[in-house]
Amino acid sequence: MVNLFLPDFYFNSRMNQAFIELKENNPEYFNENCNIKAVYGVFPTSIWNGEVYCAAGCANDNAKETTAWYNDRGVSLIHEFTNCKLQPFHVYDNACNIYCKISEDENNYCCIVDDLLLDYISSTYPKFKFISSSAKQLWDINGLEVELAKEDFAYVIANPVFNPDKELFNISNKDKLILVANSSHKYSCPNDSQRCRYMSQLQLDYGLTPQDSDKFSCAHCTSVNEDFYTVMRDRKHFISVEDMYGKYSEEGINNFYIYGRGYNAFDVLEAYVYYMIKPEFQDRVRLMMMINLE
């Protein structure tokens, strides 16, 4: 079974829910062994959020309805709590704690980068399971193996630089490993750490200072504006649909993040069609979804 983790459970909810319902009603459209395991993202505005800037707000009832919709259909919710600039007092943020109370469930997860939130959430909301974020930027296989061996984590998202590395097939705990299939970031991007810190601080400053979430991205990470097929062509860490359902799955690596938080909706749609839908149904499903998104 290939488990897919879809982006932006809140801002991309219409598309995510449309694909989940389509899979329920027309499973013949989908690749064999395709499973929508979880949706990831944050409710706005969560200051624990990192990597992808998130503005606006979310009513508590909306958060409850969104969580229930996914969970009632067996789809897990993953909070992307990956802000690397948090201080101890930030754990008491009212909005983030409300969202945790609403969604605390043994089938839901928190994706984190350090022990601050791991310790706080595990003691305050013990039903959550945890995912180690790729934002930790582990650069060697040994470090990845150490992370996979930690009992604190149900899953570990690998740095995309490992995707082409055949050593992945020899590591232990492959059932806990998640690979990012279509990251647009350039291989070993020297600005990635700086970008994460910038976006984390920007999230903390929401409502306090003038916001310009594109400032760093446009100056240093032009790859964020590249479309799905450019990423497919130019990134050696891109995972093709053939390899995902073929060699990776055959070697016991079955969990894949589809990138798309903050991306153009039609670019995300193209990724969904590519990874989930059988070739003979792709045009039909693409049109159905474009009409649905109008």
Language model feature labels by segment:
Residues 1-147, 153-294:
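Active-site pocket-lining/capping segments in soluble small-molecule metabolic enzymes
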